[in-house]
Amino acid sequence: MWKDDAVFKTMQQHPHYHPFVVIYPYDIYKNYDKSEIQQTLERTKRFIEGKGYEYIIPYDSERHQWVDLKSIIKPDVVFFTSPYKDSYPMYYIYHYRDTFTCYVPYGYSALELSSLNYDLIFHNLVGLHFVPNEMHKQISIRTARNKGINTVVTGHPATEVFLRKDYIPQNQWKPQSKPKKRVIFAPHHTINDPDYPSLFLDICDEVLEIAEQFKDEVQFVFKPHQVLKFKLIQQWGKEKTEAYYQKWDEMENTQLVSDGYVDLFLTSDALIHDCGSFTTEYLFVGKPVIYLCRKGIDMTKRFNEFGIHSFECHYKGSNVTEIKRFLQEVVLEGKDPMQPKREQFFEDYLKPKDGILPSQKILKVLEEVING
């Protein structure tokens, strides 16, 4: 998922930088469907082209193989979007020991995954690790072997668009015969994870039935995590997975959206999800949100200290009855007792105290480091 839009645009406007997006395959070692990986690459390419950004695909079409980026350009600065060894070794941080490296995390780290988010070899090697707030920096200091010496608090650039008063979101919603409430259903990919057990496999068909039941008053966007489809193909097979996704795209009041979410968030009325990063990001728009979690599981033990604050701003749902209640009472009837808590959370944790946007802070820090 592309989260560095604001940084890229800020660099484009800066005389010292000429940014490129590098597009290459990920999750290549997880036995995912190869055709789906290729389709993901093509969607990514179209997405970046649609933004008008310069990009590089380090692929030799004559030899049919991926090649070293350094054989095409010699980058002075590399921003990584993932800390994991999920692609070819020539795209790992080890290959850029002679290049200044930076990292903007995928999203607001809300889950209790401290070692994974702050103490991989990657986190200890990267030149600058930009984090959203002081809580995340303290987790890095406590967790990382380098004591978080490369960690800098800037806010998260992926969310600064929500702070801009001049941004006009595009309407991506399917036209309806009359105005309806707009609800996003965004399931995560942890369908078989014992530590973060998803409800998706239990309720996936019933959520479609809910969409049918509320069709006169609500329209839905199915916005799954991009990895969910890979895992469903492994579990269900390609035919059943494609049929399920197609069902979401063909009903009168439903649609499938695979790319981007900013405009969806800004034009929606509510979110149903179980995604770690969305736990905080949706709170920027101030709309009601319900988190899907299994009954009997203490989710507060699965969030870090910051994530607990985010999670406490959510309604909770463990079955379709509670989802329906959320839709009827909160979304349709406007009974929203969590609204004051969400507003206070925004003031306390999300609103920049100095008024400076994260991308501007990131470039300021980068300039200071480069110029000594």
Model features per residue range: what roles?
Residues M1-L163:
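Active-site and donor-binding regions of nucleotide-sugar-utilizing enzymes
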Residues D4-P15, P157-A243, G317-N319, L332, ...:
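Conserved catalytic-core segment of nucleotide-activated headgroup transferases in glycan assembly
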Residues V22-Y26, T81-P83, P105-G107, H156, ...:
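Short loop/turn segments at strand-loop or loop-helix junctions that form parts
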Residues E54-E62, N253-S258, F311-F326:
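Short acidic-hydrophobic, aromatic-tinged amphipathic segments that line or gate anion-handling sites
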Residues Q234-T280:
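Donor nucleotide-activated moiety binding/catalytic core segment of transferases
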Residues D354-G372:
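C-terminal alpha-helical cap of glycosyltransferases
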